[in-house]
Amino acid sequence: VGNMPPEFIYYCFSILKPFEQGVEKYIKFLNNIDNEKYVDSFLKIEKWLDETPPIPGELFRQWIKGIYQDNLLIQNKMYVGNKHVSLKNLNMPVFTQVAVGDHLVSPECSMPLHYAVSSTDKILKLYPTGHVGMIASSFSQKTVLPELGQWLKERS
């Protein structure tokens, strides 16, 4: 199948909200051009999007079909290779970070994963950001990642 180029992946996700991704984000950028914090966060996100590596085509196909369309993971029907993936078997510490504004992995989709794992050492945190903002924004650098780092440190 080959690789899925990052431009195609970005296109697939951007058509979920075409006006927001194609026009509105640039209008917001121009309206906030004097806000250094906003511009810094915007540029970090754009850089992250621009540096997305290609994804193996078969992996992309299985991910879209199995996770998005058929919801196999939460239904306890997912396999990786020949191995069954059961969330009930996950008994290690789990830190579930949910982006409230995520249009790719909505809170309604990510929160059930948190409750499906059998771990007794788990935490669920909601953040007022979007999908990419969880990793590639000023908010992420100042809040999301430090909280995750502290949580990991406490368990190492």
Describe every region a protein language model picked out.
Residues 1-58:
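Alpha/beta-hydrolase-fold enzymes
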Residues 87-91, 116-119:
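Short, conserved loop/helix-junction motifs that constitute active-site signature segments
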Residues 107, 124, 128-143:
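Catalytic histidine-centered segment of alpha/beta-hydrolase-like enzymes
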